[in-house]
Amino acid sequence: MINKWYVLDLRPGFSMAESMVEHGIDTYLLDWGTPNDEDRYLNWELVIAKLARMVRRVKRHTGADKVALLGYCMGGTLSSIYTSLYPEQVAAFVNLTAPIDFSKGGLLRTLVDEQWFDPYAMTAAGNLPAPQMENGFTSLRPTSKFSKWIMLADKYQREGFVESFNALEQWAGDNIPFPAEAYQTYIHELYQQNLLYKGKHFVGGKRADLGNITCPVLTVVASRDTICPPAAATAMNELVSSEDESVLTISGGHVGAVVGSRAPKQLYPAVAAWLIERFGKDAAPRLRDVNAEADVTAE
């Protein structure tokens, strides 16, 4: 809901969706759409309901009783809430650099501290505009607007670098507005009050208790993530009731870990192996060596 879905299908060879399909995993991506002015009243409950409709549609299309959910960044937070509310619908959950303990949110948490940040004032005129979202993330690393061009000048002769750079630039600049009511809840209840981590977050009158989650859980963290520091994500594993829960650490930042040059060799096969070892035993042996090479630690 902050950037568009295709970061997980960026371009051939640098696509998590493509890799999952190549490993024999039926894969579906949820496009949240682009909010219009009238969507300012799209609240948190309706956002979770949209995710629930997606799950029902995938189940109808595949005939499966349950689905494995993978959520990236805010999508992971939303998916964790959904899984806690409807644990019987989810066979496995992959938290891909998504914050759960927002008190560990680093600079982004400081940026939206309630002492100086009012999400209601920010959205008084309607949806939060896309440029404001982009500027907020840029403020976490102000020099990145310049350093990326220095990097391009330094590496443009490397095979495929310019293509990857342009694809990522296209996606990074393709921001969308954030629905006002959903934004207010996201910032106030999760970032400022940390209600999800405290077990006090309610959706439609139901408490989102992460302790309800008993399915296998994999939390993926990026070692240099400034948007979701590792501790903000690994809190997931502290709260779930799953007997099968692991942490996978990938080198890189919040975006680089997912679409960077190492992602096709590190992230994609490791996540595929984790899923296949649980739901496709016949295919697991040929991937087990890849999983062993990754920094995977069982909790």
What is each PLM-predicted segment?
Residues D39-H61:
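Alpha/beta-hydrolase active-site loop
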Residues T226-A232:
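Conserved alpha/beta-hydrolase "acid-adjacent" motif
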Residues R60, A64, L70, L78-E181:
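Alpha/beta-hydrolase-fold enzymes
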Residues M1-N36:
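Short, surface-exposed "cap/lid" segments of acyl-processing enzymes
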Residues A233, E238-V255:
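Catalytic histidine neighborhood in serine/cysteine hydrolases
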Residues I213, T219-V221, D225:
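Short beta-strand/loop motif that positions the catalytic acidic residue
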